[in-house]
C-alpha cells in the first residue's frame, strides 16, 4: 500500500492526455502529478503542467508550470508560472510569474510578475513588478512597479510607473513618464508629467494662478495645477 501511494505521488510526463471531467481522464486520479505535451479537456481537466498546447471546453487547471498555448471556454487556472499565449472567455489566473500574451473576456489575475501583453474586458490585476502593455475595459490594478503602457478607464499603480498611463482616472505613487487623463494623481512626479483637467501631485507639485489681458483687452484668469515639467 505504501508503494502504491508513493508511485501516485511521483510526477510523470506523458505526450498527451484527454479528459472529459476530472478524474475521468486518461491520467485518472494521478492527473495532478502528470505533465503533458498536449492536453484536451472536454469540460474540465487537471494537470501537473503543460509544455505545448492545451484546449479546454470550460476549465483548464494546472498545478505546475505551463508553456506554449492555452485556450479555455471559461477559465485557465495555473498554480505555477505561465509562458506563452493564454486565452479564455472569462478568467485567467496565474500564481507564479507570467510572460507572453494573456487575453480574457473579464479578468486577468497575476499573483506575481507579469510581462508582455495583458488584455481583459474588465480587469487586470498583478501582485509583482510588471511590464509591457496592459489594456482593460474597466480597470488596471497593479500593486508594484510597472514599465510600459497602461490603458483603461481607471489605472491604479501602487509602485512606480516608468512609461505611460492613459485613462479617465490615473493614479500612481511615483511617476517616471506621462499620465494622460481627466484626473491624474501621483505622490511624486519629479521625473514625469501629468496632462489632464485635474492633476493632483503631492510632492513638488506646481500650483499657480495667472492673470493677464489678451489682445482684445479681456481679462484672462488661469489656474495651473500639476507638475513643473508640464508648464516649463
Language model features with spans:
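Bacterial Sec-dependent N-terminal signal peptides
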Residues: 1-12
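Surface-exposed, glycine- and small/polar-enriched segments that build interaction surfaces at terminal
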Residues: 10-232
Amino acid at each position: 500500500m505504501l508503494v502504491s501511494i508513493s508511485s501516485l505521488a511521483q510526477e510523470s510526463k506523458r505526450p498527451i492526455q484527454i479528459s472529459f471531467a476530472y478524474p475521468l481522464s486518461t491520467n485518472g486520479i494521478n492527473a495532478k502529478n502528470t505533465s503533458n505535451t498536449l492536453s484536451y479537456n472536454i469540460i474540465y481537466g487537471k494537470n501537473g503542467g503543460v509544455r505545448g498546447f492545451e484546449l479546454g471546453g470550460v476549465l483548464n487547471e494546472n498545478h505546475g508550470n505551463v508553456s506554449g498555448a492555452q485556450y479555455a471556454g471559461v477559465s485557465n487556472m495555473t498554480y505555477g508560472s505561465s509562458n506563452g499565449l493564454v486565452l479564455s472567455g472569462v478568467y485567467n489566473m496565474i500564481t507564479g510569474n507570467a510572460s507572453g500574451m494573456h487575453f480574457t473576456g473579464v479578468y486577468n489575475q497575476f499573483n506575481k510578475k507579469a510581462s508582455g501583453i495583458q488584455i481583459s474586458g474588465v480587469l487586470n490585476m498583478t501582485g509583482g513588478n510588471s511590464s509591457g502593455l496592459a489594456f482593460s475595459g474597466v480597470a488596471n490594478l497593479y500593486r508594484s512597479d510597472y514599465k510600459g503602457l497602461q490603458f483603461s478607464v481607471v489605472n491604479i499603480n501602487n509602485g512606480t510607473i516608468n512609461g505611460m498611463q492613459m485613462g479617465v482616472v490615473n493614479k500612481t505613487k511615483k511617476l517616471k513618464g506621462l499620465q494622460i487623463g481627466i484626473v491624474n494623481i501621483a505622490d511624486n512626479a519629479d521625473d514625469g508629467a501629468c496632462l489632464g483637467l485635474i492633476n493632483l501631485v503631492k510632492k513638488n507639485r506646481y500650483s499657480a494662478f495667472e492673470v493677464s489681458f489678451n489682445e482684445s483687452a479681456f481679462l484672462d484668469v488661469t489656474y495651473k495645477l500639476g507638475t513643473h515639467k508640464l508648464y516649463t
